[in-house]
């Protein structure tokens, strides 16, 4: 983008575009994370309020982790139903189950999310299961909660805090319903 032709979508160093900028000003950049560290008095922020919720959720590292969590949950459900059918000799009724998983996402490759960095990523899947043991299938209704509980701390990456800065939490939450049927062996 040529600056003479209107608003530029890039930051420049020595006339060379180095990174995209947010023309709307709706999401935080590194300077905003620093400003909150120095002046926010430790108040927790959410990805939604700082304009990075969709960007985080749609990033390749996070989508990959969501997919991995879904695969693990699917395998868990099939094993759980099979075990319940075996335990009750095929006479199991509907039952509730919960599956939890924790991993780490790395979004440092996105210039806008570098301050979020490596985040602990959680999922919790609560389901109602209606098995049909004779046919080897089941119906499910689930509510999946994906979330991060992160901190903005150690901004120099040397293990020290700035004497005037205050560590603060960065949280993000997403809820996804699911309903369907599956088979098990």
Where are these regions (language model features)?
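Short turn/helix-capping motifs enriched in Asx and small/polar residues
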Residues: 1-28
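Catalytic toxin/effector domains delivered as secreted proteins or via bacterial secretion systems
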Residues: 35, 39-40, 44, 52-185
């Amino acid at each position: 983008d040529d600056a003479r032709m209107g608003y530029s979508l890039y930051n420049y160093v020595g006339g060379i575009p180095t990174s995209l900028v947010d023309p709307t000003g709706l999401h935080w950049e590194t300077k905003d994370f620093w400003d909150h560290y120095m002046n926010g008095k430790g108040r927790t922020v959410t990805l939604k309020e700082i304009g990075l919720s969709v960007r985080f959720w749609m990033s390749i590292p996070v989508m990959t982790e969501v997919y991995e969590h879904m695969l693990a949950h699917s395998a868990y459900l099939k094993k759980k139903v099979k075990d319940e059918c075996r335990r009750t000799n095929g006479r199991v009724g509907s039952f509730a189950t919960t599956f939890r998983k924790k991993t780490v996402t790395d979004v440092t490759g996105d210039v806008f999310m570098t301050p979020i960095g490596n985040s602990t990523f959680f999922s919790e899947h609560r389901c109602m299961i209606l098995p049909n043991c004779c046919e080897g299938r089941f119906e499910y209704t689930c509510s999946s909660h994906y979330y991060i509980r992160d901190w903005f701390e150690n901004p120099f990456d040397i293990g020290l805090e700035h004497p005037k800065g205050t560590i603060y939490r960065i949280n993000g939450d997403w809820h996804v319903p699911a309903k369907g049927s599956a088979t098990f062996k």
